[in-house]
Amino acid sequence: MFSTTTNNIEGHPVREYLGIVTGEVIVGANLFRDLFASITDIVGGRSGKYEDVLARARKEALGEMEAEAAKLGGNAVIGVDIDYEVLGQNGSMLMVSASGTAVVI
């Protein structure tokens, strides 16, 4: 499965547009609280633990989006956009969402 932020894949013309596909992942409060308590690896203002959690959430959201594209018969997703949104009363949750257009190339 190809996924790209661009609207085309050079050398692979789009044969069919199948529609918008999405994937969402929500990281809950307990995870962030646990990470806050154990931030001992901050180097230069960065936390490896937070970055790992965000990377996993992003990968899962992209995976869900690609799985939805495959269910529609697509073999690529173009125009991919990844968004992050804080949710909950105290900003206790983070949603990572990926969206794009499923296509056949």
Swiss-Prot record:
Gene3D superfamilies: Hypothetical protein apc22750. Chain B. It comes from the Bacteria. SUPFAM superfamilies: YbjQ-like (SSF117782). InterPro entries: UPF0145_dom_sf, UPF0145_YbjQ-like. Pfam families: YbjQ_1. Belongs to the UPF0145 family. This is UPF0145 protein Sala_0338.
